[in-house]
Amino acid sequence: MTADTGGHIRYLMGLVGASEQDPTVERITIATRAFRGFLGDEYWQTRETVTPKIEIVRFPTAQPGYLPKEELWREVPSFADAVIEWIENQPKRPDILHAHYADAGVVAAIVRERLGIPFVFTSHSLGRVKLDAFTRSSGEAMTDAAESLEHRLAAEERALADAALVIASSRDEAEIQYAGYDSYAPGKIRVVPPGSDLTMFTSARSSIAVDRMINRFLDDPDKPPILAIARPVTKKNLIAMVEAFGESPELQNRANLVLIAGSRTDIDDLEPELADNLTRILKTIDRYDLYGKVAYPKGHRPEDLPGLYAYARERRGIFVNPAFNEPFGLTLLEAAAVGIPVIATDSGGPNDIVEVCGNGVLVDATVPRSIADAALDILRSPALWHKYAASGAAAVKAYDWKAHAKRYHGLMRSILSTPSTEPARPAQLLITDIDNTLVGDEAAHAQFCRWLARQNGVGFGIASGRSFHSAMMVLEQEGSPRPEVMITSVGAEIYYLTGDSTTYVGDDEWAKIIDVNWDPDAVNEILGTEPGVHPQAELEQRRFKVSYLTDGDKGLRRRLQEKFAAEGLQCTVTHSHGRYLDILPVRASKGAAVIHVRRRYGLSEDQVFVSGDSANDTEMLRTLPQAIVVQNFTDDMANLPELAHAYFASTGYAAGIIEGVEHFKNRAVTPAV
């Protein structure tokens, strides 16, 4: 039992509750460890029926007593033996296992090895992230519980290596956190954010109890509150909130700070980590003399939570999540559903939530000043506050357990389908951009899906500026066909669908080709001297792609090409939508990647179709003769001489793709006169 246990159980029960609604799911068994101890005899009960479809089965291990999670790794062998014995005695074996957390991943790997049952792995949190966060906050290597952490890292490596599929909560987890592991295989990871039941937050109102809880601390309770809700553990970084507030006289003048830091009776009775962090918070409040400006109630009831968010909304406040890393970010969704702008760490799930909902900003939470600056930007602008507050309603629709279960079950069914040895090579290949080409119009997209299903021998692929996981998230959310080839990060990476029709494998040959003479450090040094150019978040940087945001300078691309040439750097420069700047190795681009794929498949130029809508598609479109520009194009593409050969469709989005392909097909069969 830890301070995280309630959230973990809430997630698991939300997942199985949504899963049991699927009529194709016959039975769900939650396998956990049986133990005796202070929590009562119910945890020694062998079997517990939750619903007609859901059961909990508890397995005894070598040590019958309660154990803290750091010591559970010693019980893995006996737990695995017990699970295997139970499975072998069942009238029907489970079709698939889903392992949650590192130790369960090893158990599932043992079951797979002995019984051949595939498994899916969800880490929820990673040992390397914990180690990095501790080192960053203390400046020291982590020595306590070192043996446990060593086993955890080894367990995570094995789970990653042996799982049929890995489910991550966020792009940050999939692309940054897992990347530090030897067994990292990005094509085997899918980002499927957890669902959330936000109904109690959408109509939340403050209450007299909540008002009393907070206002008794404040000299001026009508000021907008800067609200944070988190347990006072180190990784939640609540101290940064107090430092940001204490260092900004303007923020103190404009707002109050409200810290809901768990519940306590006596600080001395708390776990050492919680007690130490609360003591630091109180000392920092005292150091900055913030009395009358900061509320830090001793506790709250679960039913108070919606009212706490509503308290902030009613006073035009802001919700802040300053964690070093946030695996998902449920509190951000709760705040969004209530209608409060958010400021969140740029490490973890908040990247995806803010992108989907558009309800706030991301900051480097290790720099308290960045939190204060972001808060002041919102507080100074009523229009910006309203924009972020109104945008949060998207959270209710986007993060829902029903939608989660639909994607989750689709992946499970795909994993369990009979695998082929190797996907057949297509006779023709269609490669399209995603945003505002394949997707952007629901009716056109649905028409495209029906049309593609009838195109025998036509392979389907995408070429996007998005990363692999970002692209896959959009495709799966939109219900797009699964591509056979994915050219991502503006051509810096190529992935191919494997024989299981679910996971992908990266093109290592392509990586070697484009790596020649690539010097990203030198590129960044030059960009650092360019006015109006700012790096995109860490999540958008790739091994072979340096990404920046710009102020729309139309001469920027040519100027940078000249600067790179003067320094002997050969790079591909794309500047699209007047805002997004990507620098890649000279051999990397969408067009070059399409040519590489074409040759790998043994196709001629007239067997490949490409389509797009913006400047970052131009190089691909000019490279291939059968190029399609959809009607809703941008960046003055109709006047580009290099696209004189392209077909400009009269219809937009995916309908324009269909129109273009049919145009080239008809031209190929029409005899010359």
Give residue spans per PLM region.
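Asp-based phosphoryl-transfer active-site loop
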Residues: 426-443, 621
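Catalytic cores of nucleotide-sugar-dependent glycosyltransferases that transfer UDP/GDP/TDP-activated
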Residues: 1-333, 337-418
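Active-site phosphate-binding/coordination module
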Residues: 444-538
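Short beta-strand scaffold positions
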Residues: 99, 121, 168-169, 344, ...
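Conserved acidic, metal-coordinating active-site core of Asp-based
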Residues: 522-623
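Structural alpha-helical scaffold elements that stabilize or flank donor/cofactor-binding regions
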Residues: 90, 159, 311-312, 423, ...
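Receiver (REC) domain switch/active-site residues of two-component response regulators
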Residues: 164-165, 484, 625, 646
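Mg2+-dependent phosphoryl-transfer enzymes with acidic/Ser/Thr/Gly-rich catalytic loops
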Residues: 584, 591-673
